[in-house]
Each structure stands twice: as C-alpha cells, then as structure tokens.
C-alpha cells in the first residue's frame, strides 16, 4: 500500500526516474500555520550531492499544490510535488532484465510481472523525498504541542558510539555532514563511509531518534499500540532492518528489577521503556533506534540472474549512497512525526470528555 495513517493519512507517489515524486496529506486540521521554509529546509537536509551521499544532485524544490491558503492549512488535502530534474536513466539500460542482489527487482517482478528498472522505481530511496515532505507537515502540527523530534547517526559499520543516550549531541549533529551524534567519532564514521565508497562497496548505519515534549496518552491498546505504529512506520523505510524502542534487545538480557521504571513523587526514575507503557505514551521522552543495512547498490562485480534464468556477472553504473543510513536519519524523523501527528488526532475521540471538548461542550 502507498497510504499510511488512520486520521492523518499520508500517501506518497512517484518513481526514482519518473516525472516527479510527491505526497498527499489528508486529515490535517484547518488553521495550522504552514511553514514553507521549514518544509524546504527538511528536504534540503535529505538531499544528496556530498561525498558521503549519492552524487545525484537534485534541487528538490517543493511545490505545494493544495490545502494551504494565506499561510494556513485549510483542512483539505495538502498535495506536495517535487520534480525530478537529474535522472540518468541510461545508466540502467543494462539492468532491464537483470535482478540486482539485495534489491526489490526480483520480488517486484515476480509479484507484479512488471517493474521500472530505472533506479528501482518505487523501491528507490528517492521515494523518501515524499516521506520527508509529509513529515515536515506533520511537524507543523506537533509544534503546536511543543513536541520535538530529533534524529542523528550513532553508528556506522563497526564504529558505534558508547555515549549514553542523554549525552548524544544533537546540536553537533545539526552541523555535521553525516548527522553524527558523537563528535569524537565523526572522523571515524566519515572514514568508514569513504573507505567503503573507495572500495566500490557500502556500509550500514544506526540512527537514534529522541522525541521530547511528549504528552501522556498517545497510542491505542493491542493492535494500534504506539510502539507498533512506530515500528511499522520505520520498518517501511527503505533499507531498515531493525527498530528498537527503549532498551530494545537489551531488555531481553535484563531482570525486571532493573528494567522496570519506578515512580516517585509523581515522576519516573528511569526510562527503560523508551516512553511507552502498554502501547501508550507515558510522557517521558520517546527513545528509538533504527538500523539500516548497507546500500545494496555497490560498484563491485556481482553475480545474479536475469528474468530468463541466465547466470550473469555484472557491474553497476549510476549514482548511489555509500551509506544510506546517513540520509535515513532525516527520513526516520519524518516517519516518527507522521505517527505522532496521527495519534494526536486519534485522541480527540479517545473518550467522551475529549469528544465534547472538541465541540466546546462540558
């Protein structure tokens, strides 16, 4: 499916080498101040063009087609489009019938019987432009509640920061070319990425996301738990292979006496849960870690088959990220924002008082 969300519905469209990519956000309340500069800044953060990302240079200028009037949302669908200006489709001519390892080529072809071989079509990281645009719009709603979502890179390849989560430096990450959260490891991260690129290879990365200013009560019970929604959103991002919330995998190694978040004087004394209990936010910071596999597009010689079953050796052309997780940190923030904005809107009907308040009734 290409649509995500319950009350705030986000739909993305477009392919890597098509005319454009974009999104439609339906369900945004009227009267939210629309910050077009912020939208463009978020898209600019996701852009490639540096030696640590894809060399593909796109202006990524957002055009808002609907849903905004005189600087405010109208309550109607918000359509945003970003035109592709720098696709080199000829680089993919030799891949028309070939299945690239670790890509969606094989599965797309056998599911649909047709696939866009130019840059991977819908399975390309280019689709994340739409996610970042949608996440930026969601952030405009979250601002009204002083909810702030921040992400950065805490691991590249075998280099992983040993800083405590509260020590991660988001101010440094804002200035870092690779959104690095640990100033002492930035050079190691960069070297790891460049070494992978220079050896015609790629490398994975780990992204940390913190949400501050959280309210109590976001999320539903059982099948629409906040942690379920967040995992769903993040696992839908290209190249993501794992998501942790709070202690995550660590919790399986702990005892309850250590993992439980005790309360005293109306406050939690720790946050092993990552801000979620019973699928509902408890007001503490949301803590998430997202793990990206190495970019599957590498320039080393590889083996595969074509759609006729022939064995082949090939070398890729084109322009690809040596570490997709770097720009993935921007996408992670976007998806978390979409989830939280959706949950905020769902809460208006969570109980009778909320529903009456929506109509100004007591």
Curated annotation (Swiss-Prot):
Cofactor(s) recorded in Swiss-Prot or TrEMBL: FMNH2
A Pfam family this chain is assigned to: Chorismate_synt
UniProt keyword list: Amino-acid biosynthesis, Aromatic amino acid biosynthesis, FAD, Flavoprotein, FMN, Lyase, NADP
Origin species: Campylobacter jejuni (strain RM1221)
Keyword NADP in record: yes
MF terms in GO: chorismate synthase activity; FMN binding
A single BP term in Gene Ontology: amino acid biosynthetic process
Co-factor binding details: Reduced FMN (FMNH(2)).
Job of this protein: This reaction introduces a second double bond into the aromatic ring system.
EC number(s) reported in the record: 4.2.3.5
Binding site residues for NADP(+): 46
Pathway the protein takes part in: Metabolic intermediate biosynthesis; chorismate biosynthesis; chorismate from D-erythrose 4-phosphate and phosphoenolpyruvate: step 7/7
Description of how the protein assembles with itself and partners: Homotetramer.
Protein name (record): Chorismate synthase
Similarity comment text for this entry: Belongs to the chorismate synthase family.
SUPFAM superfamilies per UniProt: Chorismate synthase, AroC
CDD domains according to UniProt: Chorismate_synthase
Catalytic activity: 5-O-(1-carboxyvinyl)-3-phosphoshikimate = chorismate + phosphate
Lineage: Bacteria, Pseudomonadati, Campylobacterota, Epsilonproteobacteria, Campylobacterales
